[in-house]
Amino acid sequence: MAGREGGRRQRRTKRKVCTFCAEKSEAIDYKDINKLRKFVTERGKILPRRISGNCAKHQRELTRAIKRARNIALLPFTTE
């Protein structure tokens, strides 16, 4: 046991690229339900940046668009 180090190996994960920056899209449309659904879980929660890979600017815009779509009943707040 001498000489063994008890520790976890650190994995280098590839940094996710913001999909909105890659597409060079101007604004995130709250009426585009198919695009917004990719960033919402089955339970209706908004995916965090570290999972979705969005930059801070687009994550804020995405959150506003999802909340706006929920308020006008385009997206559900929760599932059944």
From Swiss-Prot:
<dbReference type="GO" id="GO:0003735">
    <property type="term" value="F:structural constituent of ribosome"/>
</dbReference>
<dbReference type="InterPro" id="IPR001648">
    <property type="entry name" value="Ribosomal_bS18"/>
</dbReference>
<keyword id="KW-0687">Ribonucleoprotein</keyword>
<comment type="function">
    <text>Binds as a heterodimer with protein bS6 to the central domain of the 16S rRNA, where it helps stabilize the platform of the 30S subunit.</text>
</comment>
<keyword id="KW-0694">RNA-binding</keyword>
<dbReference type="Pfam" id="PF01084">
    <property type="entry name" value="Ribosomal_S18"/>
</dbReference>
<keyword id="KW-0689">Ribosomal protein</keyword>
<dbReference type="GO" id="GO:0070181">
    <property type="term" value="F:small ribosomal subunit rRNA binding"/>
</dbReference>
<protein>
    <recommendedName>
        <fullName>Small ribosomal subunit protein bS18</fullName>
    </recommendedName>
</protein>
<dbReference type="InterPro" id="IPR018275">
    <property type="entry name" value="Ribosomal_bS18_CS"/>
</dbReference>
<dbReference type="GO" id="GO:0022627">
    <property type="term" value="C:cytosolic small ribosomal subunit"/>
</dbReference>
<comment type="subunit">
    <text>Part of the 30S ribosomal subunit. Forms a tight heterodimer with protein bS6.</text>
</comment>
<dbReference type="InterPro" id="IPR036870">
    <property type="entry name" value="Ribosomal_bS18_sf"/>
</dbReference>
<comment type="similarity">
    <text>Belongs to the bacterial ribosomal protein bS18 family.</text>
</comment>
<dbReference type="GO" id="GO:0006412">
    <property type="term" value="P:translation"/>
</dbReference>
<keyword id="KW-0699">rRNA-binding</keyword>
